[in-house]
């Protein structure tokens, strides 16, 4: 039993050396957020990353919690083409849940486990400048990222803090905008030229004929979208991953956040547990 523990540590050692001092952007959502054991394991993983010299930055979602709060307030959520229709009242609720509740819970749990986390949203220091998303028709205050101003993130990580970001952006019109957390995480990772972007999802990664694909290039990932292998909610995640890699991010990992310690298993082991998208070396 003891030698097994030693072997695990030895397997992790080259990765700890390789990633020391590097920035990881992690999108926290899905099963990892809903299952208590997975949520606790996520917090532990982030703390361990931090203590091995990695600089983690968290971007979180919270769609189910927003819908539940709306129902509690007697407002029925409305979706159009899979996107939440966000009028002014809904945007207030989105901001209340993401910034005022979920963000603070993540920060509290990280700090209770030995971290130094600080909660912010895209409006702080104009981190995320947004504009109205019109691709799916008029769905209200749903935004896309126009620009990322990462100076506040540099200031936080240089002072040993773990930034925890709620994906609420600020428009040049002064309005708040609800931004997809995967998209926000990808754009933030690009602005920082992060070593890794890790997307926690509800599935094991990119699948073909029910089997996990461990590694893909951006070109291969796009071909899987074109040929119908990648469908539904996985399409925007793969598109985010491709955009991030082509924008200078070292690699993107799509993993199942419902698996306890999914981040450590993916990053610190030879085999990994999900799909890694990166350019061919050389």
Swiss-Prot record:
Regulation of this protein's activity per its record: Allosterically inhibited by arginine.
Residues bound to substrate: 62-63, 84, 178
Binding site for L-arginine: 196, 214, 266-269
Catalysed reaction, written as an equation: N-acetyl-L-glutamate + ATP = N-acetyl-L-glutamyl 5-phosphate + ADP
Predominant place of localization: cytoplasm
Temperature notes for this entry: Active from 25 to 80 degrees Celsius.
Record GO cellular component, one term: cytoplasm
Subcellular localization: Cytoplasm
One matching Pfam family: AA_kinase
Single GO MF annotation: ATP binding
Biological processes, Gene Ontology terms: arginine biosynthetic process via ornithine; L-arginine biosynthetic process
Pathway the protein acts in: Amino-acid biosynthesis; L-arginine biosynthesis; N(2)-acetyl-L-ornithine from L-glutamate: step 2/4
InterPro entries: AceGlu_kinase-like_sf (IPR036393), AcgluKinase_fam (IPR004662), ArgB (IPR037528), Asp/Glu/Uridylate_kinase (IPR001048), Glu/AcGlu_kinase (IPR001057), NAGK-C (IPR041727)
Protein origin, superkingdom: Bacteria
Site (Transition state stabilizer): 27, 237
Enzyme Commission number(s) of this protein: 2.7.2.8
Family membership: Belongs to the acetylglutamate kinase family. ArgB subfamily.
Quaternary context: Homohexamer.
Stated role: Catalyzes the ATP-dependent phosphorylation of N-acetyl-L-glutamate.
Name the UniProt record assigns to this protein: Acetylglutamate kinase
Gene label: argB
